[in-house]
């Protein structure tokens, strides 16, 4: 057995290198032509049924408006019913023929089942499931006193997606529908204080990569890995040990000098990619390069993140190099939309 592994250790790397050297160029050309076909023959979602979780604000809200403009029927789910009603009203004005609001906590399996059941009772079909609900926790691991208080991050960011997908899968298979998964570039980026959030996004990315194989061509999956997008998270809304915290100084520490993309632009790109049948979408597009840095130069990425996101010894936690650049140069007004600098995110 050891001899087999020794042989593979010697043969597998050079074989893979030369295989990719000759295979990748024609394969990329093939994918380019597929993308053209996807653009020419995009899915028409008019009259189709789209379920969106976390639709009361941020990316979920803007995704609802984008689907509404295309004439889709919507089922909007979130914990804040009043905000959902406001989103639903605007979605109707934008062109959605029918909008259903369901108050639900996706961390609870029974609530996720309720969302799917009400969808089928109302429309009798389900075409797109947009798994979007999520929260962000921010804390250094060694500063966490009760680590069980961070279970909510995984309950919502991971299990909420699992529950919704499990209950919706039979109906999506019948309609040969699509799942749009709001993961994050944090699934590969080692941002300090975001270990729980990063882990939840890495878990969900791999979960849906596996489901691609299990579902095959019956259910399409578009995996979205955005950078920093205009939302309540980039307004400074965090969850620490189960408690909601509004901390824009910590937001400045965590976002640092990274430009924040306007949510309308991100939502347009996500829906456009979904109806084209694309497997992956990263917004803003330039954020894809961070994956290659992580893949080929992980040591460099770790050094940069320590420099930008961690304070020097003896300095306050929030006095990081990245935040100092924001404070002393005035570039914050160029990098952050005005909407993320409001003192209080939307709340019911």
Curated annotation (Swiss-Prot):
Membrane topology qualifier: Single-pass type II membrane protein
Record SUPFAM superfamilies: NAD(P)-binding Rossmann-fold domains (SSF51735)
Keyword hit for Oxidoreductase: yes
Pfam families recorded: adh_short
Domain of life, per lineage: Eukaryota
Chain positions of motif Proline-knob: 13-26
Residues spanning the membrane: 10-30
Tissue-level expression: Expressed in seeds (at protein level). Not expressed in stem, leaf or root (at protein level).
Keyword Transmembrane: yes
GO cellular component: cytosol; lipid droplet; membrane
Residue positions binding substrate: 184
Swiss-Prot/TrEMBL keywords: Lipid droplet, Membrane, NADP, Oxidoreductase, Signal-anchor, Transmembrane, Transmembrane helix
A GO BP entry: steroid metabolic process
Molecular function via GO: 11-beta-hydroxysteroid dehydrogenase (NAD+) activity; 11-beta-hydroxysteroid dehydrogenase (NADP+) activity; 17-beta-hydroxysteroid dehydrogenase (NADP+) activity; estradiol 17-beta-dehydrogenase [NAD(P)+] activity
Binding-site list for NADP(+): 54-80, 105, 132-135, 197-201
The reaction(s) this protein catalyses: an 11beta-hydroxysteroid + NADP(+) = an 11-oxosteroid + NADPH + H(+); an 11beta-hydroxysteroid + NAD(+) = an 11-oxosteroid + NADH + H(+); corticosterone + NADP(+) = 11-dehydrocorticosterone + NADPH + H(+); corticosterone + NAD(+) = 11-dehydrocorticosterone + NADH + H(+)
Subcellular location: Lipid droplet; Membrane
Protein's job: Has dehydrogenase activity against corticosterone (11 beta-hydroxysteroid) and estradiol (17 beta-hydroxysteroid), with higher activity against estradiol. Possesses higher dehydrogenase activity with NADP(+) than NAD(+) regardless of the sterol substrate. May be involved in signal transduction regulated by various sterols.
NCBIfam families for the chain: PRK06181.1
Free-text note on domains in this protein's UniProt record: The proline-knob motif may be involved in the targeting to oil bodies.
Family named by the database record: Belongs to the short-chain dehydrogenases/reductases (SDR) family.
Protein name: 11-beta-hydroxysteroid dehydrogenase A
């Amino acid at each position: 057995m050891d001899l087999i592994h020794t042989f593979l250790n010697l043969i597998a790397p050079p074989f893979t290198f030369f295989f990719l050297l000759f295979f990748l160029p024609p394969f990329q050309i093939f994918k380019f032509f597929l993308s053209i076909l996807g653009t020419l023959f995009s899915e028409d979602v008019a009259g189709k049924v789209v379920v969106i979780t976390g639709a009361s604000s941020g990316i979920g809200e803007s995704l609802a408006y984008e689907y509404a403009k295309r004439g889709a029927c919507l089922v909007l789910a979130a914990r804040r019913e009043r905000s959902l009603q406001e989103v639903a009203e605007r979605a109707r004005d934008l062109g959605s023929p029918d909008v259903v609001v369901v108050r639900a906590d996706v961390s609870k399996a029974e609530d996720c089942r309720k969302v799917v059941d009400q969808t089928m009772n109302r429309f009798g079909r389900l075409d797109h499931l947009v798994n979007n609900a999520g929260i962000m926790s921010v804390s250094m691991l060694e500063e966490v006193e009760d680590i069980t208080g961070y279970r909510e991050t995984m309950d919502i960011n991971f299990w909420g997606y699992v529950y919704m997908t499990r209950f919706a899968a039979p109906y999506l298979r019948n309609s040969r529908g699509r799942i749009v998964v709001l993961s994050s570039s944090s699934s590969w980026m080692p941002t300090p204080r975001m270990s729980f959030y990063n882990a939840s996004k890495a878990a969900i990315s791999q979960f849906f990569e596996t489901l691609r194989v299990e579902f095959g061509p019956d259910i399409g999956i578009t995996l979205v890995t955005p950078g920093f997008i205009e939302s309540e998270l980039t307004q400074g809304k965090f969850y620490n040990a189960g408690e909601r915290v509004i901390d824009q100084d910590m937001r400045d520490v965590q976002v640092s000098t990274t430009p924040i993309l306007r949510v309308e632009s991100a939502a347009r790109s996500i829906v456009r990619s979904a109806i084209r049948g694309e497997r992956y979408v990263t917004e803003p597009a330039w954020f894809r390069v961070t994956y290659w840095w992580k893949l080929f130069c992980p040591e460099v990425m770790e050094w940069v993140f320590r420099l930008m996101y961690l304070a020097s010894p003896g300095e306050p936690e929030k006095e990081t190099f990245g935040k100092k650049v924001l404070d002393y140069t005035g570039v914050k007004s160029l990098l952050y939309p005005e909407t993320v600098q409001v003192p209080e995110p939307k709340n019911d």
